[in-house]
């Protein structure tokens, strides 16, 4: 079975810091600990409203991350320019609404194909690997292929939010089918959103999944168990699911 990688999202370290307008806890320190514990990459979402990660964080993390930076961002001119200036290893294009608590669904690539394609091409030309955060829908996967994105990240939020075992299994089947279809098209498949220590194994077991991006559940557990232990435990669960 192939390896699976963990990208740790540290947005909520910044959320905690910004709640009091202090300089601590610092996402830069969190990234260092996560990497030490086995994280294969660090994911941050620079939102247009700067509600958690700040421009300062992006700049410093770009210099200090030892693994790879995955910058999540909306498809806007401002964000594309920031990415071109920062040059992270990866950019994940995501939908964004100011009123949402967190990203609510996948990017509608079909509905804004030209816009997403233009951003993807511009970032790719700068040597940045682009991923599109989409639902496990064939049309969206095909549109991602049209855009020239080498990666997609399948939205696992509906799977994570399922209230019954039957609903969860139905969502898992959709994700599995989407991952298989994208793999057939030559797209590398990541996944994430709402994944926890209790629901990660079935997603991690899907052979096409290259990387999982997980944040909230890891940071939540870190409050009680410490960040290093929490990252290591998540990575261990993912690896065990592949055996």
From Swiss-Prot:
Its EC number is 2.6.99.2. GO terms for cellular component: cytosol. InterPro entries: Aldolase_TIM (IPR013785), PyrdxlP_synth_PdxJ (IPR004569), Pyridoxine-5'_phos_synth (IPR036130). The record marks 153 as: Transition state stabilizer. Keywords: Cytoplasm, Pyridoxine biosynthesis, Transferase. The keyword Transferase applies. It comes from the Bacteria. It catalyses: 3-amino-2-oxopropyl phosphate + 1-deoxy-D-xylulose 5-phosphate = pyridoxine 5'-phosphate + phosphate + 2 H2O + H(+). Transmembrane segments: none annotated. It is found in: Cytoplasm. 1-deoxy-D-xylulose 5-phosphate binds at residues 11-12, 47, 52, 102. GO terms for molecular function: pyridoxine 5'-phosphate synthase activity. The keyword Cytoplasm applies. One of its GO terms (biological process) is pyridoxine biosynthetic process. Disulfide bonds: none annotated. 3-amino-2-oxopropyl phosphate binds at residues 9, 20, 194, 215-216. Pathway: Cofactor biosynthesis; pyridoxine 5'-phosphate biosynthesis; pyridoxine 5'-phosphate from D-erythrose 4-phosphate: step 5/5. HAMAP family: PdxJ. Belongs to the PNP synthase family. NCBIfam families: pdxJ, PRK05265.1-1, PRK05265.1-2, PRK05265.1-3, PRK05265.1-5. This is Pyridoxine 5'-phosphate synthase. It comes from Vibrio parahaemolyticus serotype O3:K6 (strain RIMD 2210633).
């Amino acid at each position: 079975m192939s390896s699976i990688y963990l990208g740790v999202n540290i947005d909520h370290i910044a959320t905690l810091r910004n709640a009091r307008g202090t300089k601590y806890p610092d996402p830069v320190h969190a990234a260092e600990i996560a990497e030490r514990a086995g994280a294969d990459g660090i994911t941050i979402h620079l939102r247009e409203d700067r509600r958690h990660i700040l421009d300062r964080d992006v700049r410093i993390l770009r210099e200090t991350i030892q693994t790879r930076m995955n910058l999540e961002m909306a498809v806007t001119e401002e964000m594309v320019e920031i990415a071109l200036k920062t040059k992270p290893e990866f950019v994940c294009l995501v939908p964004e609404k100011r009123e949402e608590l967190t990203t609510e669904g996948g990017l509608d690539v079909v509905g804004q194909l030209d816009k997403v394609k233009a951003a993807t091409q511009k970032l790719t030309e700068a040597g940045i690997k682009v991923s599109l955060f989409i639902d496990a829908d064939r049309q969206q996967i095909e549109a991602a292929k049209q855009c020239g994105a080498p990666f997609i990240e399948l939205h696992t939020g509906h799977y994570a939010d399922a209230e019954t075992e039957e609903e969860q299994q139905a969502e898992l089947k959709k994700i599995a089918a989407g991952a298989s279809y994208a793999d057939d098209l030559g797209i590398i498949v990541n996944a994430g959103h709402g994944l926890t220590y209790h629901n990660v194994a079935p997603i991690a077991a899907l052979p096409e999944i290259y990387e999982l991006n997980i944040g909230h559940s890891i940071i939540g557990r870190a409050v009680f168990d410490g960040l290093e232990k929490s990252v290591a435990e998540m990575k261990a669960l993912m690896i065990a699911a592949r055996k």
